[in-house]
Amino acid sequence: MAHIELKNITKKFGGHTALTGLNLNIPDGEFFVLLGETGAGKTTTLRMIAGLEKPTEGQVFIDGVDVADWSAAERDVALVLQQYSLYPRYTVRQNLEFPLRPKIRRLPDAEIKDRVARAARTLRIEHLLDRKTDRLSGGEMQRVSIGRAIVRKPRVFLMDEPLSALDAKLREALRTELKNLQMQLGATFLFVTHDQIEAMSMGDKVGVLNHGRIVQTGTPQEIYNNPRDTYVASFVGSPPMNLQEATVDDGKIVFSGGQSLPLPGRFKAKVNAGDKVVFGLRPDDLYPVGHGLHSGDAADVHEIELPVTVTEPLGNETLVFAEFDRRDWVSRMLNPRPLRAGDRVAMSFDLSQAHLFSAETGKSLRA
């Protein structure tokens, strides 16, 4: 187990800057998820911690020691990749043993046997030990790949989108298994992904990375409920937050089509008349009347009638897309009732749950 800290990391590849002034602190034993779109710098960050890349500027600390000049082997970290990195001609047992053999670790045979048995038992792959890996399913191969990391007993587990090549059902199962494994081992995990469902369901903490910068870190609940800017609001959450540009005028939020809403009191000290803002509301906080519960003050509850553009039935709920100010707003409707495109539906929402962002900077104005 280990404490990881990155200080003011900048990484350049020729004229391209992959990371800019990145700071990251991962306590010992934490499951930390780095979430970002393709090209955000997630894998570059992982490779610098692993010792496969050196920062252009800044420092990498493991347990308080600057390891910038240490090789990957000296850092004692384990890397699990999207591609399984297994030897197809070897059995599962031989693949698990390989990192421990004389040329690598020089462990006694008894110790190797014990570590392999423990890893196989933990990952429930004991029945596969004598099978060659080219005869395994994708999920089984990924378990073996994780097992190769476990047998080493590394200080840190680094995981680069290990579930992205699996089908949806298997990804869901392995999300739970990986989280349980991390708690069982008590190890430090850094898991990178572009999938916000993986991030929110697995991480003790999540860091959102955008164009080489960490824009927000916090628990999944903190990031979902209090996004720091419009990027986080639109990226985290499925469906994402409804965002609509507006102008502040005479104590109201006025939209371009002429509709207006009262400006919530907590924002009044943060904006002036004429300010351009972005109004935000989660689909969970926008209900067809009679299909949701509002926990706030009744004075904050408002209703608007909107035309339905499309619906997405999901069984126990339906996503309703309805046009507001020339954009589709999304509502999550529980206890679904039949709705069709063109229907007009009364929508209810609680302004105490609304978000407001600066249109100029994208930063949250929420208290």
Predicted regions and their residues:
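ABC ATPase nucleotide-binding domain
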Residues: 5, 25, 61, 346-348
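Conserved coupling/switch loops of ABC nucleotide-binding domains, chiefly the family-specific signature
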Residues: 56-59, 211, 354
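Helix-to-loop junction immediately C-terminal to a conserved catalytic motif
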Residues: 50
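ABC ATPase nucleotide-binding domains
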Residues: 76-78, 82, 86-231
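Conserved ABC transporter NBD signature motif
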Residues: 58-66
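The feature captures the beta-strand-to-loop junction immediately N-terminal to the Walker
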Residues: 35-37
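Glycine/charge-rich catalytic "coupling/switch" loops of P-loop NTPases
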Residues: 252, 257-309, 338-367
